[in-house]
């Protein structure tokens, strides 16, 4: 299970600026419900919300606090498309079916927007996202994708910016050009997650914190999920723990399909008027390298800058300085700026970077492998699973058809493979 010492949120800029929110109770006694969801991040909550809104009984068990993992620590980018790119989807299912997947990715972003509006979630939601190209070959790849997206996916909202046009919006000389997406955007991930949790609870879902799953066993009516001092009997089981997928033997098979990649984020001091000159249209930015930088401004004018793979570096101060050096490559004018917050976390990726969710058994569902696109895709994953539980698996089935190669499961070799893979792609990015 999650390290038992991790009962509370780990320090981060997001935790320090979290909206007032309740502490949900620890599960006591034995309860019975239609669906039990293990995991109180966005995967689980975005499954619980539509179930509860449709009058379905649902319990969510969170081992630590709501949004404790990636949902409350990420860069906050809400992005259409998939991390694998539409080329991988096309290769697997063909262009016509890939167009359906494309529409799902667009709907994922709009689902975030509509839920923020419907439930009045205060999470600094801001439209605008740019993919930037560091090297000439990256710019060529970006232009090719832009043309393909226009021709086959009707992506007329995309704008292609050359170096001069990009410079009008971004105070950096590092990039060759960019593709701007006015529909994608960024938000405060912890506050968004807390808002979805409140919406689910208001709709009737029962949420429990500090209630780690310790054991699962079949019972007459479905499944019995144990926590340290209690249990939940349920018909349907949803395993929504992402990077913690291998924590229970029954779900060890999921560990073969996704691996946790570490990432690190720093937050500067408030930049005041300098922030407006840094990113003039307040968009989120990510480059299109394999080992990439991602950054954006916070609502109070800080630069939040993330990247790196800290798999073999356990010193937070060292990681802070490494990411700061990457920030200064993009914005050397920030050399005098203090770093006030730094934190790390894990992102689960599949081998081909396509999302991985579906069923392990008729009443056992899972979601993982968003590969950096989880702020948006969790909404569609949760909706697809909820719809399937309620009898309509039309949205879930196509995602189940996506093929995923196995990843080695031995812990040290997973870490080593992740590290060596990162180094290989860093080399590839620079050549």
Regions found by a protein language model. Name each.
Residues 1-35, 53:
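Extreme N-terminal leader/targeting segments of oxidoreductases
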Residues 2-17, 84-90, 114-195:
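Flavin (FAD/FMN) cofactor-binding and adjacent substrate-gating region
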Residues 31-60:
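N-terminal Rossmann-like FAD-binding beta1-loop-alpha1 element of flavoenzymes
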Residues 53-73:
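Glycine-rich FAD pyrophosphate-binding loop
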Residues 74-103:
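Glycine-rich active-site loop/strand segments that organize a redox cofactor
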Residues 110, 119-126, 213-215, 230-273, ...:
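Active-site substrate-recognition segment that forms the wall
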Residues 140, 147-148, 173-235:
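Helical element adjacent to the flavin cofactor pocket in flavoenzyme catalytic cores
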Residues 313-316, 320-430:
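C-terminal catalytic lobe of FAD-dependent flavoproteins
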């Amino acid at each position: 299970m999650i390290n038992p010492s991790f009962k509370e949120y780990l320090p981060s800029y997001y935790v320090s600026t979290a909206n007032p929110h309740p502490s949900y109770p620890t599960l006591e006694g034995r309860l019975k419900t239609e669906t039990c969801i293990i995991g109180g991040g966005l995967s689980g909550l975005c499954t619980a919300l539509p179930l509860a809104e449709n009058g379905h009984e649902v319990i969510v068990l969170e081992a630590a606090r709501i949004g404790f993992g990636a949902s409350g620590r990420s860069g906050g980018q809400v992005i259409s498309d998939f991390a694998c790119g539409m080329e991988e989807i096309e290769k697997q299912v063909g262009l016509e079916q890939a167009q359906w997947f494309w529409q799902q990715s667009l709907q994922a972003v709009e689902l975030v927007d509509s839920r923020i509006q419907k439930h009045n979630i205060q999470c600094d939601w801001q439209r605008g996202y740019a993919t930037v190209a560091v090297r000439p070959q990256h710019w060529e790849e970006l232009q090719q994708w832009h043309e393909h997206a226009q021709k086959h996916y009707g992506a007329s909202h995309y704008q292609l910016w050359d170096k001069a046009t990009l410079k009008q919006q971004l105070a950096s000389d590092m990039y060759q050009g960019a593709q701007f997406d006015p529909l994608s955007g960024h938000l405060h991930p912890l506050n968004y997650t807390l808002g979805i949790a409140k919406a689910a609870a208001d709709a009737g879902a029962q949420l429990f914190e500090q209630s780690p799953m310790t054991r699962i066993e079949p019972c007459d009516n479905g499944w019995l999920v144990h926590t340290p001092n209690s249990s939940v009997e349920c018909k349907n089981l949803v395993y929504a723990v992402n990077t913690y997928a291998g924590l229970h033997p029954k779900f060890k098979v999921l560990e073969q399909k996704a691996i946790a990649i570490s990432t690190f984020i720093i937050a500067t001091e408030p930049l005041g008027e300098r922030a407006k000159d840094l990113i003039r249209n307040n968009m989120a930015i990510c480059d299109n390298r394999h080992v990439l930088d991602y950054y954006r401004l916070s609502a109070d004018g800080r630069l939040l800058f993330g990247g790196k793979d800290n798999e073999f570096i356990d010193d937070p101060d060292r990681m802070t300085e490494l990411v700061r050096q990457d920030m200064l490559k993009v914005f050397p004018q920030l050399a005098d700026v203090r770093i006030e917050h730094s934190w790390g976390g894990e992102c689960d990726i599949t081998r081909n970077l396509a999302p991985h969710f579906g069923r392990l058994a008729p009443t056992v569902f899972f979601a993982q492998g968003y590969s950096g696109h989880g702020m948006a895709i969790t909404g569609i994953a949760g909706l697809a699973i909820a719809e399937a539980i309620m009898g309509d698996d039309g949205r879930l089935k196509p995602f189940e058809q996506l093929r995923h190669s196995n990843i080695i499961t031995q812990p040290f070799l997973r870490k080593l493979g992740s590290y060596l893979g990162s180094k290989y792609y860093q080399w590839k990015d620079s050549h």
